[in-house]
Swiss-Prot record:
Classification of source organism: Bacteria, Pseudomonadati, Pseudomonadota, Gammaproteobacteria, Enterobacterales
Keyword line: NAD, Oxidoreductase, Tricarboxylic acid cycle
Keyword DNA-binding: no
Gene: mdh
Originating species: Escherichia coli (strain SE11)
One GO BP: malate metabolic process
Protein name as catalogued: Malate dehydrogenase
Keyword Oxidoreductase included in the entry's annotation: yes
Length: 312
């Protein structure tokens, strides 16, 4: 199993690479790519960690050597948020980066599963889909927007509020991956009940958690370490499913049946070919139903922006 991380010299990429080096199954290969010249050195640094995961680093304009034979490609390349910016302010720079990298993936490892981490995910996933479609290699079961950070934040905040062990809580999060499009389904957390006020406050905190980190870092970056952990969790789940493990479920932002929007984050059963089944979002509370209806315009606009970027 070969995993490639594109954008591996950045804050998310380095954290993700460290976690994959220590947690990928024995015998896996990990390849790191970034435009930054430091990247081969990041790989050398990580290569000193005693795990049976082979690692190589590549830098420069061409990601091809890193992508050859990759089964999973995780893309975290791009610029980070600064205070006062929201994820959509990143669009102008990051759209071009994602387009370029996905074009390279389409040529070198068209059958790989691709996880897009680069924000704004609502839009960058649509860009990736259109690029793959133009290249004639798009498989909607193999393209994912990584929204796992919303899930781990939800798990953490719910556990804190309710005095639970964080590892015991699993909150499904649907919709998209920015602002109002992030919808934690708090009504579906087993064995926990919330007041209306708690639901309103928690939902807002989960939606704004990225901004909380950006402000706390005082201009020195955005959520890189927790995002690295979230991306590793998703990447490792994908690897386990590709290797034949049964019953692996993760939420991610994928193209589905278009019931709500062309791309939508929902629980997915993962399998040997990527998405095996798009699971139902279940029964929503009145609050959640309202929030779902209220986000769809924003989500659809985000998606259209990505489609137009490639097709203009």
């Amino acid at each position: 199993m070969k995993v490639a991380v594109l954008g591996a010299a950045g804050g998310i990429g380095q954290a993700l690479a460290l976690l994959l080096k220590t947690q990928l199954p024995s015998g896996s290969e990990l390849s790191l790519y970034d435009i930054a010249p430091v990247t081969p050195g990041v790989a050398v640094d990580l290569s000193h960690i005693p795990t049976a995961v082979k690692i190589k680093g590549f830098s420069g304009e061409d990601a091809t050597p890193a992508l050859e034979g990759a089964d999973v490609v995780l893309i975290s390349a791009g610029v980070a948020r600064k205070p006062g910016m929201d994820r959509s302010d990143l669009f102008n720079v990051n759209a071009g980066i994602v387009k370029n990298l996905v074009q390279q993936v389409s040529k070198t490892c068209p059958k790989a599963c691709i996880g897009i981490i680069t924000n704004p995910v609502n839009t960058t996933v649509a860009i990736a889909a259109e690029v793959l479609k133009k290249a004639g290699v798009y498989d909607k079961n193999k393209l994912f927007g990584v929204t796992t950070l919303d899930i781990i934040r939800s798990n953490t905040f719910v556990a804190e509020l309710k005095g639970k062990q964080p590892g015991e809580v699993e909150v499904p999060v649907i919709g998209g991956h920015s602002g109002v499009t992030i919808l934690p389904l708090l009504s579906q957390v087993p064995g926990v009940s919330f007041t209306e006020q708690e639901v309103a406050d928690l939902t807002k905190r989960i939606q704004n958690a990225g901004t909380e980190v950006v402000e706390a870092k005082a201009g020195g970056g955005s959520a890189t370490l927790s995002m690295g952990q979230a991306a590793a969790r998703f990447g490792l789940s994908l690897v386990r499913a590709l290797q034949g493990e049964q019953g692996v479920v993760e939420c991610a932002y994928v193209e589905g049946d278009g019931q709500y929007a062309r791309f939508f984050s929902q629980p997915l059963l993962l399998g040997k070919n990527g998405v095996e089944e798009r699971k139902s979002i279940g029964t929503l509370s009145a609050f959640e139903q309202n929030a779902l209806e209220g986000m769809l315009d924003t989500l659809k606009k985000d998606i259209a922006l990505g489609e137009e970027f490639v097709n203009k």
